[in-house]
Regions:
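Basic nucleic-acid-binding interfaces
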Residues: 1-23, 29-72
Length: 72
C-alpha cells in the first residue's frame, strides 16, 4: 500500500528508535546510535512516497522491508 512521508517518519521514530535531528523544508533528517556507529536517513514529507524512495529510505536506515511492513 502507499505510505506518506509522515507515516514513514512515525514508524521509524516510534518503532525503530530513530530521533529527528533537523528539518529543512519538506525533508527531515533522522538518526540513531547503534553499537556499529550512527545510522541516518532523509525522509521527504510527501503525501505519497514512491516505491524506490521508500526502499532507499529503508536501505539508509538499515531496516528490512519485512520488519517495516509489520507496522504499515
Amino acid at each position: 500500500r502507499k505510505i506518506s512521508g509522515k507515516e514513514c517518519l512515525k514508524i521509524l521514530c516510534n518503532k525503530f528508535g530513530f530521533k529527528i535531528v533537523r528539518q529543512k523544508g519538506s525533508h527531515v533528517l533522522i538518526k540513531k546510535e547503534t553499537e556499529h556507529g550512527k545510522i541516518g536517513a532523509v525522509i521527504p514529507l510527501h503525501r505519497e512516497l514512491k516505491i524506490g524512495t521508500l526502499k532507499s529510505i529503508l536501505e539508509q536506515a538499515k531496516v528490512s522491508e519485512d520488519d517495516f511492513s509489520k507496522f504499515v
